[in-house]
Amino acid sequence: MIGKVDMDYASLEEEYMTESEMEDYLDELRHKIPSFIVELLKNNLKNRNLTRNQLNKIVNRVSDLYFGKKPEDKKAAELTNKINDLSHKLDALMKVATVSSATKVSDDIKKEIDNLDELDLAVESPRIESPQTLEPVQKIEEIDEIEISEIDTDDELPIYEEELIPEIELIENPEVDTEVDTINSENYNSDVVINNSAKIGSLPEPTKELDRTTGLENEVKIPMDYVEVKNMESEIAKINENTRLHELPEDTLSTMLIFKWLEFLISRVGTNNLVDVLDYYYTLKWISGKSVNKLLKISKNMKYFHEDMEWKASKSMTPEDHVVSLLYIEKLAGRPISMDELEEMEREITRIKKWANELQTL
C-alpha cells in the first residue's frame, strides 16, 4: 500500500503542469520574491511544458540570482568557519609556545647568573690569600726602620718643632687640626716626628691652589638669579621641542577645529576644570605652554549650554575622551590619523582584550 502511494506522488511530480497551475504556483510566490520577477517568469514560461520539479529549480535559480546568492557561498562560508577555527587554535598554540619559551629563557638566565657568581668567588679567593702583596710592605717597613736608626734625633728634633707649627696653622682642615692637638711636643717620639714631617711637607701645595681658586671666585662673581633664569629657559625650550603641538595654527580651519576641541573639553569638565586638563596635557608633553596660554585666552568668552538642566561637569575625563583630545592635537599639529589606522588600532585593542579574557579563563 505504501509503495502505491509513493508511485502516485512521483507520477504527480513528473506530470506536466497546466498554465493555470503554473500561474497559481507563481502567484503564491509574490510574498517571497518581487512581483516583477513573477511577471517575467509568467511571460517566459508560457506555452512550455514543465513539471513541478523543473519549475521549482527555475524559481530557485532566479531568486538566487536576484538576491546575489551563489552555490559557492555555502562553500565559502564553510571555508571561513574552518579558517577561523584554525586561527583560534594557532593563537592558543602560540600562547603556549611563548609561555614555555619564556620559562626556558628565565631558567637559562638563572643558571648563567649562578655560574658567574661561582666564577667571581673562585677569582676573589686567591687574591685574598696571595702572599706576594705582603713582601713589598715588609720591605718598606724595613727601609723605614733603617732610615730612622741612622738619623740623630737630638739634632733634628728642634728643627721639626719649629717647622711643624706654622705649616699646620695654614691648613684649614678640621681633621688635621684635631690630629695636631693630640700631639704633645714634649712627649713625642722620633718615629712620630719623622712620619708627620713627611706627610705635612706635601700639604702646603694644595693650600696655595685653594688660595688661587678663592681669589678667582672673589674676582668673578656671577649672580645666581641670572643662572637660574638661564637654566629655566633652557629647560622650557627642551620641553617645547619635545611636545606634540608646539604652536596653534592661525588659519580658519584650524581655528574652527580649536573651538570644537574647546567645546568638547568644556562639555566634559566645564570651564572651571579646563585649566587642570590643559595642565595635565602639558605635563604629558602633548601641548606646549604657549598653546596652553592661547587656549585659555580663547576659552574666556565661551559658554556651554547643556540640554539637560541638571547636568554637572566632572573633574576628570574618561580614557576615551583623552583619545579624542589626542586626535584633535594630532590634527592641529598637521599629522592627522587616517581611518585605516584607527580601524587597525581598534582591531588590535579587541585582540588584546580577547587574549586577556582567554588568559583569565585558563
Swiss-Prot record:
Kindly indicate whether the keyword Endoplasmic reticulum belongs to this entry: no
UniProt keywords (A-Z) are: Archaeal flagellum
Quick one: where is this thing mainly located? other
- InterPro entries membership: Arch_fla_DE, FlaD_prd_arc, Flagella_assembly_related
Q: Which GO terms describe its biological process?
A: archaeal or bacterial-type flagellum-dependent cell motility
Q: Which GO terms describe its cellular component?
A: archaeal-type flagellum
User: Which Pfam families would you find in this protein's record?
Assistant: Arch_fla_DE
Superkingdom as given in the UniProt entry: Archaea
Q: Which family does it belong to?
A: To M.jannaschii FlaD, also to FlaE.
Q: What name is this protein filed under?
A: Putative flagella-related protein D
The organism of origin for this protein:
Methanococcus voltae
